[in-house]
Curated annotation (Swiss-Prot):
SUPFAM superfamilies: NAD(P)-binding Rossmann-fold domains
The family this protein is said to belong to: Belongs to the short-chain dehydrogenases/reductases (SDR) family.
Annotated Pfam families: adh_short (PF00106)
Residues annotated as the enzyme's active site: 207 (proton acceptor)
Gene3D superfamilies in UniProt: NAD(P)-binding Rossmann-like Domain
EC number in record: 1.-.-.-
Chain intervals for the UniProt region annotation (Disordered): 309-329
Binding-site residues for substrate, renumbered to this chain: 194
A single GO molecular function term of this UniProt record: oxidoreductase activity
Protein name per its UniProtKB record: Uncharacterized oxidoreductase Rv1543
Keywords noted in UniProt: Oxidoreductase
Gene Ontology CC: one annotated term: plasma membrane
Binding site for NADP(+): 58-82
Amino acid sequence: MNLGDLTNFVEKPLAAVSNIVNTPNSAGRYRPFYLRNLLDAVQGRNLNDAVKGKVVLITGGSSGIGAAAAKKIAEAGGTVVLVARTLENLENVANDIRAIRGNGGTAHVYPCDLSDMDAIAVMADQVLGDLGGVDILINNAGRSIRRSLELSYDRIHDYQRTMQLNYLGAVQLILKFIPGMRERHFGHIVNVSSVGVQTRAPRFGAYIASKAALDSLCDALQAETVHDNVRFTTVHMALVRTPMISPTTIYDKFPTLTPDQAAGVITDAIVHRPRRASSPFGQFAAVADAVNPAVMDRVRNRAFNMFGDSSAAKGSESQTDTSELDKRSETFVRATRGIHW
């Protein structure tokens, strides 16, 4: 048996285990943490108690993860504030929320370009004037770029754009809403980061750098606000099937979370207010990188060579990738379920 056969032999059982432990249940909980189900039953903790009577602002609330999370929160009794660029899409989600069985949910819409700091300030002031404050802020909006270093030499704007939306936009929202949270001695800021921050996924340098910047900032801010009962949670989200990943058509063959599963991870974080919410594989990757980064570099390099740049990243007029995954690649993808390569 050569090294390649041995690797493939190991990856197959890993793929089976990965499918089990890296897929959250309907409550947004990864299987190794199911003990929380019992604790919640004993303690009576649920989403209704966490959000009822609370104002919850969600960026990127017009589709995908944000829309799915908004509906869950509204069903549980929270007042949802939806923020995104397109008013029509926001209204569609808001109407779905208002049509919830019973008395319907409460939803407010505020269209805003979240890469424009002045526009964010104006929108935030409107929210404060209309609703008095925000109890839970979910920084979910984001821009992802998958492009190798070789194709990025003349594309500094990729780094600027991702930092503007993923980092500075979220920071502006935090700065606008956290004073009220501190005054009321309650607040929760949930940042939807990426498992890529833990795995250091190749081709995603611009994207994960912007997410890591927000992660580090909020680690520092948490130390300043613990006594104010303001909590920060970083959700290292696995790969989710949303419009954001559609330009990379090879992801059609990757196992992903659904928006509803991802929304469950967020709502579970709202209930428990952990510092970090991560998949088991993401946690393993972070520890492995700390212990032996050289080995992890080789794993990442293998993935880099296994999956090429998309047609969109190459600037091709055709947005269709013709490459197919071979059996080794398929096994590797299943073994690293939820990771964007």
